[in-house]
Swiss-Prot record:
Keywords: Disulfide bond, Electron transport, Redox-active center, Transport
Biological function: Participates in various redox reactions through the reversible oxidation of its active center dithiol to a disulfide and catalyzes dithiol-disulfide exchange reactions.
Residue stretches making up the Thioredoxin domain: 3-138
Domain of life: Viruses
Record's protein name: Putative thioredoxin-like protein 453L
Disulfide bonding pattern of the chain: 44-47
Residues annotated as signal peptide: none
List of catalytic residues: 44, 47
InterPro entries according to UniProt: Thioredoxin-like_sf
Entry's family note: Belongs to the thioredoxin family.
Species annotation: Invertebrate iridescent virus 6 (IIV-6)
Site (Contributes to redox potential value): 45-46
Amino acid sequence: MYQQKYFEKPVYYLQRNDFDDNGNLIVPELRNKKVIIMIQANYCGHCTNAKGDYYKAAKYIKELEKNGGTSYKNKVVFATIQADGDEEGEKELNQILDKIKPTFVGFPDYVLYVNGKRIEDDGPPGRNFNNIVNYVMG
């Protein structure tokens, strides 16, 4: 888990070593947390359009947590997988993308993990701020 230039905190970039071979999150800091992951690529126009609302949702949830406005206090993490990234550990994620999101069909896509395990659903119903916030708060 690291920080990069495209997204700033509170969105974290995930790497191959953050997952086991079955696609489970294994980062100790993410235990007992709800983690929403945006799977995206820089060349993807839809991803570029979706990044603003994703980042805005991440900041909004963190602000709610800071002010005690959510029962998920300090338990929601926003992360991303940079499928076309050039950092060590990013491209290797493509090898297990089918384990991380078995129903993946294109960029951007979203997947939710709770306590390191993937939740079997289709993700938020849309890419906008309200869809993302309602999804992680639900």
